[in-house]
């Protein structure tokens, strides 16, 4: 498990090797850990631009293999394409010399978790709902659902479960 301090220390080391600024948007459990909603995460998930991803991947070392690190590109997270403003909506966590670290907005975390919706996702959603407006969530979901790479009916079904369990 990786806590917030370990994650920030790791990123500070990466920051020293960069020459240009890049924005890392933490997603999933990584975002929740940075937001203080979970004590730790089992893996590291970031979304960044395609150009920044190539730079970040080149900085990866053998030591980085101690963690499972997933990099997503241009708002395409797991199986959904988030709206273009996902990075603007994300909360800034820390600004280093070259890395701007953000955490995906709670509304967008719920939308990404709706695709899989397992027991761990439901626990995470329970921690997020107090920070999310139901109407905003529904509008955001309708923007994203058409981009879903899986079966849209299943994604809609999971979303309805979330609305019933957490927003009624």
What are these regions (language model features)?
Residues 1-168:
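Compositionally biased terminal segments of proteins
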